[in-house]
Amino acid sequence: MTSGEQAKTPLQAPILLTNVKPVGFGKGASQSSTDILIGGDGKIAAVGSALQAPADTQRIDAKGAFISPGWVDLHVHIWHGGTDISIRPSECGAERGVTTLVDAGSAGEANFHGFREYIIEPSRERIKAFLNLGSIGLVACNRVPELRDIKDIDLDRILECYAENSEHIVGLKVRASHVITGSWGVTPVKLGKKIAKILKVPMMVHVGEPPALYDEVLEILGPGDVVTHCFNGKSGSSIMEDEDLFNLAERCAGEGIRLDIGHGGASFSFKVAEAAIARGLLPFSISTDLHGHSMNFPVWDLATTMSKLLSVDMPFENVVEAVTRNPASVIRLDMENRLDVGQRADFTVFDLVDADLEATDSNGDVSRLKRLFEPRYAVIGAEAIAASRYIPRARKLVRHSHGYSWR
């Protein structure tokens, strides 16, 4: 049984969702307000207006809220207990409107078995993972770098780990910045790409403080690969401070390299995102890079991250696509015919509301969000989980290996 998918269990009560407005289901799908009946087996039983339902049905009046395919967060860290930065899936999953979580390299080949047993298998959300190229993954993130030299990579064990976990592992993850690789530069990206080719899976590369250069990374990647932190504002790694880099990123995106937001504590800039989008360069996917050092400040959750992109003029429909169909394609998750009778229910019910919320990017720049994505329910099979945005707690000054920071 894969995570987020039920084995043979007793039937639950049916669910009737009324007055929902479909969005993000692809060309040709109806966008008219409708009702959806989900059977006790978790599969869609009927779609239409004024549906009849059994007496024991759980009835949810969405009051005109949107319904989309279940949201996918392509970049989180949820190996809780196995790394020093990971959070629990429950902190960023269904209760935040997200039905599929993709862990971005928290586990390496040496500890993926624990991640599978203690996190993936018990989770009600669907969980997939990019396997870290470094054997230890993010056990002590940035304190014990996972890619210092070639001794940190074991090709044979990576191949073996993938063979044993191919239903869970969707690609390889490489963090390519000097905090991790030091003077090793772009070499880990080259090694990772070679292994990804052998496994026939995509690679996700974290770009940040050079070396490696963002430019070098893009030149190595190919169609289907992912560059995360695409709109970071770091010196030497911002696509808006170097016209050649912007043009390269634009060309690579056109060729099928996936630009992923990966907000995180240090990797999203309002200014960079606004300038890039104004020039027509949109991110392929919107993800959070949620972990213990970024959740309370500045990220919060996927809905708020989506709202940030909306605030810098990314169109509503593109924002929805960037958390549904687009990231789903990276992990080979079929998004076709999601509203057809007989399909397993996997939805997010949400509103888009007027607001006046102060939000911060990773550089400390502030923007006021005038429109907010507000998740209401995550529907996973025959379970409708009430959802809401994360409400941050009061921040505190925390000492860590590099000094102090607000969290």
Swiss-Prot record:
Positions bound to Zn(2+) 1: H75, H77, K173, D289
PANTHER family: DIHYDROOROTASE-RELATED, IMIDAZOLONEPROPIONASE AND RELATED AMIDOHYDROLASES
Enzyme class, broadest EC rank: hydrolase
Family the entry assigns: Belongs to the metallo-dependent hydrolases superfamily. Atu3266/EF_0837 deacetylase family.
Cofactor(s) demanded: Zn(2+)
Site (Transition state stabilizer): R175
Name of the protein: Deacetylase Atu3266
Origin species: Agrobacterium fabrum (strain C58 / ATCC 33970)
InterPro entries named in the record: Amidohydro-rel (IPR006680), Deacetylase_Atu3266-like (IPR020043), Metal-dep_hydrolase_composite (IPR011059), Metal_Hydrolase (IPR032466)
Binding positions for Zn(2+) 2 per the UniProt entry: K173, H206, H229
Keyword Cytoplasm: no
Assembly: Homohexamer, dimer of trimers.
Keywords associated with the record: Hydrolase, Metal-binding, Zinc
CDD domains noted in UniProt: Met_dep_hydrolase_B
Function summary: Esterase that catalyzes the deacetylation of acetyl-(R)-mandelate (in vitro). Can also hydrolyze acetyl glycolate, but with lower efficiency. Has very low N-acetyl-D-amino acid deacetylase activity with N-acetyl-D-serine and N-acetyl-D-threonine (in vitro). Theoretical substrate docking studies suggest that other N-acetylated amino acids may optimally occupy the active site and may in fact be the physiological substrates.
Pfam family, one: Amidohydro_1
